[in-house]
Design a protein with these regions (language model features):
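Sec-dependent signal peptide recognition
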Residues: 3-11
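Hydrophobic h-region of N-terminal signal peptides that target proteins for export
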Residues: 12-20
Length: 231
C-alpha cells in the first residue's frame, strides 16, 4: 500500500500547489482562542516528565489535549523543527509509518500533507492537508511560536483511490513558548482534532493523547539535538 500510495503523491502535490498557493483559507479563530486560553485545562497525567492536560471544547464531543514541559532551550530552535515538514518522516519516530510532505511554501506559511495508517481492523486510514505558520494566530498573540489548522479537502480524492482514507478537516494546534525564569521556557503543544469516521470517542481521545505526547517528545528531542550540534 505504501508504494501504491507514493505513486500518486507527485500528481497530488502538483495539483495542490496550484490550488492552494493563491487561495485564502480562513483560520478557525474561535478554536484557536479556546486552545490559547489558560482556563479549564484539567491535568490528565502528571506522572512523567511531561504534563498532559485536557480541555472540553464547547459543542464538541472530543477533548483538546495539551502536553507541556519546562526546558532550557531557545524558542527559535523549537520553531525551526516544527516548521521542518520535509524532515518529519525522519525525526517524528514515534509516529510509526505516518507519511508527511511539504506541498507548498510561501513567505507567510507552509502547506503540508499527512497520511496516517490506522492499524485496526475495519477502520480506514486517515489523511489531511494543513497550513502551518511560524508565529502567533492573532496580533496580540505573543506566546504562540507556531500555529496550524487543517485545510478543506480539495484534491485529496487522488490519494483516496489508493488508500480509501478518511479525510480530516476539523482541527488546529498551537505551539506555546512562555518564559518562566532565566534560561527556562515552558513549551506546550495544544491541539484539537476530530479524526472522523466510526471510531468511538473514548478511543479517539486515547489516540489523540498518545499522538500529541509522542509528537511533542520527538520534536523536543530533535530540537535539543540541533541545539547541541550548534554549540
Amino acid at each position: 500500500m505504501r508504494k501504491y500510495h507514493f505513486k500518486y503523491l507527485s500528481i497530488l502535490f502538483f495539483f495542490l500547489n496550484s490550488t492552494f498557493s493563491d487561495s485564502y483559507v480562513p483560520k478557525p479563530t474561535k478554536l484557536f482562542n479556546l486552545l490559547y486560553e489558560e482556563d479549564n485545562w484539567e491535568v490528565f497525567d502528571s506522572s512523567s516528565s511531561n504534563l498532559v492536560s485536557t480541555k472540553k471544547i464547547p459543542g464538541k464531543d472530543l477533548f483538546a489535549v495539551m502536553v507541556e514541559k519546562e526546558l532550557n532551550l531557545p524558542k527559535d530552535v523549537v520553531k525551526d523543527v516544527i516548521m521542518d515538514i520535509k524532515n518529519y518522516n525522519r525525526f517524528l519516530k514515534s509516529s510509526g509509518s505516518m507519511i508527511s510532505d511539504e506541498i507548498n511554501r510561501t513567505s507567510e506559511y507552509i502547506d503540508g500533507y499527512q497520511f496516517i495508517p490506522i492499524r485496526l481492523p475495519f477502520f480506514d486510514d486517515r489523511e489531511y492537508l494543513f497550513r502551518i505558520y511560524p508565529n502567533g494566530f492573532k496580533e496580540d498573540d505573543s506566546l504562540s511560536i507556531v500555529h496550524w489548522h487543517l485545510l478543506r479537502d480539495q484534491g485529496h480524492s487522488l490519494i483516496r483511490k489508493s488508500s480509501n482514507a478518511t479525510y480530516l478537516n476539523n482541527g488546529a494546534g498551537l505551539w506555546f513558548a512562555k518564559n518562566v525564569a532565566k534560561d527556562r521556557t515552558s513549551f506546550s503543544y495544544r491541539i484539537y482534532i476530530d479524526p472522523g469516521g466510526s471510531l468511538p470517542n473514548f478511543l479517539i481521545d486515547l489516540i489523540n493523547k498518545t499522538s500529541v505526547v509522542n509528537i511533542f517528545k520527538d520534536a523536543i528531542a530533535e530540537a535539543q539535538k540541533r541545539h547541541r550540534q550548534k554549540n
